[in-house]
Design a protein with these regions (language model features):
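Conserved beta-strand elements of beta-rich interaction domains across eukaryotes
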Residues: 11, 94, 107-109, 131, ...
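Noncatalytic modules at the cell exterior or secretory-pathway interfaces
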Residues: 97-101, 170-190
Length: 216
């Protein structure tokens, strides 16, 4: 109960201001149901293939506290029209001429031991930033990375018990580059979401990138 009270106090910082005008709704390419039985069958890493990439840095920002740097976290937080979390991912050189698939894995409480809070209608937006840019521990709402491509789509719902493909396409890493940093901010107009990003507590939860050969 004490933990819940602390998180509830954090969520109470949301004051109902509008989300950024350049925020783009999440593009859900496909989804698949996760069943209760999957937790017992999920090895370490769950259903993620070998080599799946997880965020290298996650930084919350707040529209109501636009100059406050909250620093790195493994517990992303999203609140209605206030807190967003920026996710950095680094694409290695092995992604050259490959397909990158951005997934959001969202198991139910019965499928993961990772604690999370989810409350609301489940609408989220994802604002992309320019390639080779991303958040730093000092990033705030007022000094976000420069804008970049975002997956255009109608409003989408993320709900527990599902695994979502947010976007899939060329990795775009130039030939000869050792790596390329990509990033984006997850926000919501109507939903509280706080979770522990992990792939080691039953089924994995959070954002991941899977690199694969392009389909012919």
């Amino acid at each position: 109960m004490k933990t819940l009270a602390v998180v509830s106090a954090l969520l109470s910082l949301a004051a109902g201001l509008a989300i950024p005008e350049d925020a783009t709704p999440l593009e859900i390419i496909s989804s698949r149901p996760l069943t209760i039985e999957e937790r017992s069958s999920c090895p370490k890493g769950g259903d993620l293939p070998k080599g799946a990439l997880q965020p290298t840095l996650m930084v919350p920002i707040s529209k109501n506290l636009p100059d406050v740097a909250f620093g790195p976290t493994w517990n992303p937080i999203v609140t209605p029209n206030d807190f967003c979390t920026i996710f950095n991912l680094v694409i290695p050189s092995s992604g050259f001429n490959k397909t990158c698939t951005l997934e959001f894995l969202f198991p139910s409480h019965g499928q993961t031991f990772s604690p999370y809070i989810y409350n609301g209608a489940g609408h989220f937006t994802f604002t992309g930033y320019a390639f080779f840019s991303g958040a730093t521990p000092e990033t705030t709402y007022n000094n976000q990375p420069p804008p970049g491509p975002s997956p255009p789509s109608p409003p989408a719902v993320l709900a527990p018990g599902n695994a979502y493909v947010i976007n899939a396409g060329p990795c775009f890493i130039p030939e000869g580059e050792a790596s390329m940093e990509v990033s984006g901010a997850l926000c919501s107009p109507d939903t509280d979401l706080v979770y522990l990003q992990t792939e080691n507590m039953g089924c994995p939860i959070g954002f991941y990138v899977v690199i694969s050969d392009p389909e012919e």
